[in-house]
Amino acid sequence: SPSRGLGDVYKRQVHGPGCPVCVLPIGRVDLAIRLALERGVILCTYGDTLRVPASDGLSLMKAKARGGDIRMVYSTIDALQIARDNPDREVVFFAIGFETTTPPTAVAIQQADAEGLRNFSVLCCHVLTPSAISNILESPEVRQWGTVPLDGFIGPAHVSTVIGSRPYEFFAEEYRKPVVIAGFEPLDVMQAILMLVRQVNEGRAEVENEFARAVTRDGNLKAQDRVAEVFE
């Protein structure tokens, strides 16, 4: 009924690694800080990494205050331009994010190579969504008890527009965990939860795509090709 909350239908929702900054290891931020303070590079990064806490009470913002040449950029294009404008300085792009931000990084690396920008490099900290799911499903609890206390997964919208729904099929087939890809809007999420609950109640383990208006099974093949050309 309209008066019932989602909590009455769905017992518990556990937030996954939705934010690339939240899953960024401190050691990677420490390395970026060392590059700026000790190597004297121009470190380019997205704004949401500047305040991430690092070791010894530092952050990129505080390292900048200590004299590090750390610059916020809005895209890899900005970082490339900084490298062009500073041919005598080493420019490092601190690349973070899931599959959504990986293709622009790949394009930047290819562009730098095409232009012969030998002073441009990337500190790659991109992460993969299917690998994160695999890590959860292969956690110590699985080895100890033979199960993981999760009934299913709500697949991410933005990432899935790039990788498609195909990569999730492995988890449904091999682990018997249903996956429903949800869109961005509240109604998208509510519908995805309903679809997920129906699968659980019916004993099904399939990949369903609630966000069919933007996500296909194969995803963005051009973006995938760029990533495959650059990254292992």
Descriptions of predicted regions:
Residues 1-6, 10:
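Single conserved hydrophobic/aromatic residue that forms the stacking wall/gate
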Residues 11-53:
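Active-site cofactor/substrate anionic-group-binding motifs, chiefly glycine-
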Residues 12-15, 67-76, 114-132, 151-154, ...:
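Short, acidic/small-residue loops that bind anionic groups at enzyme active sites
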Residues 1, 18-23, 48-52, 94-104, ...:
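Gly/Ser/Thr-rich loops at beta-strand to alpha-helix junctions
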Residues 9, 206-232:
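Active-site loops and adjacent core secondary-structure elements that bind or stabilize anionic groups
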Residues 85-95, 100-156:
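Active-site histidine-anchored catalytic micro-motif
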Residues 49-85, 129:
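Glycine-rich oxoanion-binding loops at beta->alpha junctions
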Residues 143-216:
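A conserved active-site cap/scaffold subdomain adjacent to cofactor or substrate pockets
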